[in-house]
A protein has these predicted regions:
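Non-ligating segments of multi-cofactor redox enzymes
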Residues: 1-257, 263-302
């Protein structure tokens, strides 16, 4: 059944913001580089971080897994391609979208924007947009970089180059502010991506994590492992009173009592804090995250 962490679940969900801040700092340890306008190019850049964090960020401690994968997906002669693929699969199997909820810098950035006091809009009627991120993953991360390669077999990072707003936020903006030569070289591509960043910022104020829900290919990849990952959500049906408070609290539009490990669940723990009977918690173990469902279904059928 796996090991349950009821007390730890409450603590983790309560201090999630601090965990996100710590993860962002660890992902970007080289803060003085923001003033220097240079990049860290040490051994750490050969290691992929779990969340969406631009390689070109002056403070970046490691490589972005999506960017690294796009560069080498088109050729099996790069051993690095096997490493990146293996790391992504391992992270997915171990944590699933827990990474989105706790360890991703850009996810945290969107959440901070959403805290700005203004009218908030629901995304419940926009659920079909969820599938866009899978198209982005398939086309811009897998297919185009795999088939459109240069003479040495390296693909163009289409997602990073044409769509990723994190690259502008962490890379282009700070580097251009510190380097006049880079400022002079900015062109229409920067304008396009800066417009995307502005759109994400505005939407993040109104909607909860719109980029994560609709466009992020890394979230789409981890979502594929949500139902089979080692770290999961668990619902104790004997404790659940079907009050619906967990579903109402979920900003990812998931009903944890129906699908504890839905692909959209980022394991943020909002449902854990909302549950009046402590029926929801984190667990480590493989399975569907439900307990005593047979007994309940039998009783309900009487």
């Amino acid at each position: 059944m796996g090991k349950k962490f009821s007390g730890v679940s409450q603590t983790m969900s309560r201090f999630r913001g601090w965990i996100q801040a710590g993860a962002t700092l660890l992902t970007n340890l080289h803060l003085p580089n923001f003033l220097k306008g240079g990049l860290y190019q040490g051994a750490g850049k050969t290691v992929c971080v779990p969340g969406l964090n631009c390689y070109s960020c002056p403070a970046a401690s490691g490589a972005c897994p999506i960017g690294a994968f796009q560069a080498v997906v088109g050729s099996s002669k790069f051993s690095f391609s096997y490493y990146v693929t293996g790391v992504l699969i391992l992270l997915g199997v171990l944590l699933g979208r827990f990474i989105c909820g706790f360890l991703c810098p850009f996810g945290w950035f969107q959440e901070l924007l959403h805290k700005i006091p203004t009218k908030k809009l629901s995304t419940r009627k926009l659920k079909p947009l969820r599938y866009l991120k899978y198209a982005v993953l398939l086309v811009m991360v897998f297919l185009l970089p795999a088939f459109l390669v240069n003479d040495v077999g390296m693909g163009d990072p289409f997602f990073c180059k044409y769509l990723c707003p994190q690259g502008v936020l962490e890379g282009a903006i700070p580097l251009s502010l510190a380097n006049s030569g880079i400022r002079a070289a900015l062109g229409s591509l920067f304008t396009w991506k800066f417009s995307i960043l502005l759109a994400v910022i505005v939407l993040s104020v109104l909607f909860y994590r719109p980029f994560c829900k609709w466009l992020c290919p890394l979230g789409a990849f981890y979502a594929l492992f949500n139902k089979v990952s080692l770290f999961q959500m668990k619902v104790d049906k004997n404790k659940c009173v079907s009050c619906g408070k967990c579903a109402k609290a979920c900003k990812m539009d998931v009903d944890v009592t129906k699908t504890p490990n839905h692909p959209e669940c980022i394991r943020c723990g909002m449902c854990i804090r909302a549950c009046p009977t402590n029926a929801v918690c984190f667990r480590c173990g493989f399975g569907n995250g439900k307990e005593n469902t047979t007994k309940i279904n039998t009783e309900e059928s009487k």
